[in-house]
């Protein structure tokens, strides 16, 4: 099936779980300490990354969803760093602060891309703190469509069964990334996403595909789960529900560099998709595609909307050129710039394509390696040109432009000027035809500020869409 990216910006998700900060101290090593037989690292780089449940929330935000994050933190510098890190990407913190406990921190000392030692700063959460966290999280249930319980066995999610029941009673789906061998703790959840190791820890060794399905259905019945999605590394994923045949989804990863955080990406994509009304098989397919992207990156990473769109297009055999959406174009432009290609952009109505247009676009293309043509949609053409225009509808105008050898990408826009889309894409060179002053060209200031340039090209004399229309009307 061909899958399009849903409107993730409409997703409202609450993540509840064990939040932590992954901190990295990195630098060169050149000598052994005189105090002990250990290397001395001269730290020249410190990096903080939100981890655990916070990484799940970041994944949802990066996909474009609206997300709040409930977790237990201390009253310390680490909590401040964690808060700053998630707020910068649009995640709303809903902390339960316990002054006497440290915010969980994993400090890694690195040199030459090797981890020399990891220092963990954490204490077990008392059961009453977990209850307090879940009680405060209940207040958010009326605002969301999906809740993710991100369990790293640190104690934030101690006994969530009552919380799950309250969420389900409000029509909120509850997804769980489980930990440990006791799945009864998650009784009543909508969906669990164990990996194969976690699944076998609960049900015992799985002999084959049929055995996996049988044991999964037993768990569904025993603990009142609606579905299980078992992630299986190079074998992809298997979705098991009570009332439908199992669904095996093959992996889409082309190269695997690091599986760190892949589980976070899976449940994040699932949650965001389900929150906007996707059917479960479609949500699983999107999650599988997202996982295939993230395992191709080093370290704990997130997947953006643009990366997911590009991966979906690739799986459908689409070339990435021609008529594209704005998100598709943003990704294609990023890839072109990484290759060192100079991207030129122009815009217009292009209602009746004529020789003057063709000549102009050839000139524009000659100024770089790739050419984007942004096209006014039908409503904006009517506002600009008056009743009776456009003569040709948007899809036809874009199809003709995309067929020209000089044009790489065609993208529509709905405003009267291309100011917004140019400001977002920021080509290397912005081109406009006619007798404009550079300072008056929409988007020109933004392109120049980003290090690009703006150029005005002349149109071929005596050829215009208006003249063609007038000539046709005169002969009728």
Swiss-Prot record:
**Quick one: which pathway?**
Nucleotide-sugar biosynthesis; ADP-L-glycero-beta-D-manno-heptose biosynthesis; ADP-L-glycero-beta-D-manno-heptose from D-glycero-beta-D-manno-heptose 7-phosphate: step 1/4; Nucleotide-sugar biosynthesis; ADP-L-glycero-beta-D-manno-heptose biosynthesis; ADP-L-glycero-beta-D-manno-heptose from D-glycero-beta-D-manno-heptose 7-phosphate: step 3/4
> What is known about what this protein does?
Catalyzes the ADP transfer from ATP to D-glycero-beta-D-manno-heptose 1-phosphate, yielding ADP-D-glycero-beta-D-manno-heptose.
Give an example GO biological process.
ADP-L-glycero-beta-D-manno-heptose biosynthetic process
From the Swiss-Prot or TrEMBL record, give the protein name: Bifunctional protein HldE
Its assembly, as annotated, is: Homodimer.
Q: Does the keyword Acetylation apply?
A: no
- Supply the alphabetized keyword list: ATP-binding, Carbohydrate metabolism, Kinase, Multifunctional enzyme, Nucleotide-binding, Nucleotidyltransferase, Transferase
Enzyme class (EC, first level) = transferase
Q: Which gene encodes it?
A: hldE
Q: Which family does it belong to?
A: In the N-terminal section; belongs to the carbohydrate kinase PfkB family.
Q: Which GO terms describe its molecular function?
A: ATP binding; heptose 7-phosphate kinase activity; heptose-1-phosphate adenylyltransferase activity; phosphotransferase activity, alcohol group as acceptor
Which Pfam families does the protein's record reference? CTP_transf_like (PF01467), PfkB (PF00294)
User: One GO cellular component from the entry?
Assistant: cytosol
E.C. code: 2.7.1.167, 2.7.7.70
Cystine residue pairs: none
- CDD domains with a match to the protein in the record: RfaE_like
Task: Give the binding site residues for ATP.
Answer: 195-198
- Extract the ranges annotated as region (Cytidylyltransferase): 345-476
Q: According to its UniProt record, which residues of this chain constitute the active site?
A: 264
Q: Does the keyword Cell membrane apply?
A: no
InterPro entries per the UniProt record, alphabetical: Bifunc_HldE, Carboh/pur_kinase_PfkB_CS, Cyt_trans-like, PfkB_dom, RfaE_dom_I, RfaE_dom_II, Ribokinase-like, Rossmann-like_a/b/a_fold
Specify where the region named Ribokinase lies, as residue ranges.
Answer: 1-319
Its UniProt entry gives the catalysed reaction(s) as: D-glycero-beta-D-manno-heptose 7-phosphate + ATP = D-glycero-beta-D-manno-heptose 1,7-bisphosphate + ADP + H(+); D-glycero-beta-D-manno-heptose 1-phosphate + ATP + H(+) = ADP-D-glycero-beta-D-manno-heptose + diphosphate
């Amino acid at each position: 099936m061909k899958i399009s990216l849903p409107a993730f910006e409409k997703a409202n998700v609450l993540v509840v779980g064990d939040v932590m900060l992954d901190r990295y101290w990195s630098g060169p090593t050149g000598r052994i300490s005189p105090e002990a037989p250990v290397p001395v690292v001269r730290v020249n780089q410190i990096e903080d990354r939100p981890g655990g449940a916070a990484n799940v929330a970041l994944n949802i935000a990066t996909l474009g969803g609206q997300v709040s994050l409930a977790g237990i933190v201390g009253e310390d510098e680490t909590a401040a760093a964690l808060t700053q890190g998630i707020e910068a990407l649009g995640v709303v913190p809903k902390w339960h602060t316990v002054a006497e406990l440290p915010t969980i921190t994993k400090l890694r000392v690195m040199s030459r891309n090797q981890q020399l030692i990891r220092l963990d700063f954490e204490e077990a959460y008392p059961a009453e703190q977990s209850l307090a966290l879940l009680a405060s999280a209940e207040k958010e249930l009326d605002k969301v469509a999906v809740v993710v319980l991100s369990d790293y066995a640190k104690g934030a999610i101690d006994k969530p069964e009552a919380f799950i029941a309250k969420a389900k009673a409000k029509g909120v789906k509850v997804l769980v990334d489980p930990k440990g061998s006791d799945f009864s703790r998650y009784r009543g959840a909508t969906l669990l996403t164990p990996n194969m190791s976690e699944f076998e820890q609960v049900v015992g060794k799985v002999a084959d595909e049929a055995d996996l399905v049988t044991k999964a259905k037993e768990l569904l019945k025993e603990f009142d789960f609606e579905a299980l999605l078992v992630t299986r590394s190079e074998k992809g994923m298997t979705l098991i529900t009570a009332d439908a045949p199992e669904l095996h989804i093959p992996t889409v990863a082309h190269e695997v560099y690091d599986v760190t955080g892949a589980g976070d990406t899976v449940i994040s994509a699932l949650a965001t998709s389900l929150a906007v009304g996707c059917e479960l098989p479609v949500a699983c397919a999107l999650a599988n595609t997202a996982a295939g992207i993230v395992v191709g990156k080093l370290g704990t990473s997130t997947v953006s909307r643009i990366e997911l769109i590009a991966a979906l297009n690739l799986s459908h055999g689409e070339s990435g050129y021609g008529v594209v959406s704005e998100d598709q174009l943003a990704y294609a432009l990023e890839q072109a710039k990484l290759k060192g290609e100079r991207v030129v952009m122009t815009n217009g109505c292009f209602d009746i394509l004529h020789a003057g247009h063709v000549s102009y676009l050839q000139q524009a293309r000659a100024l770089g390696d790739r050419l984007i043509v942004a096209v006014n949609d039908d409503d904006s053409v009517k506002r600009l040109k008056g009743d009776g225009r456009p003569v040709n509808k948007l899809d036809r105008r874009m199809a003709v432009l995309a067929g020209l050898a000089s044009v790489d990408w065609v993208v529509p826009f709905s405003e009267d000027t291309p100011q917004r889309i140019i400001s977002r894409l920021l080509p290397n060179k912005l081109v406009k035809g006619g007798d404009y002053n550079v300072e008056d060209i929409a988007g020109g200031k933004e392109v120049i500020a980003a290090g690009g340039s703006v150029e005005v090209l002349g149109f071929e004399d005596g050829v215009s869409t208006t003249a063609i229309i007038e000539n046709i009307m005169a002969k009728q």
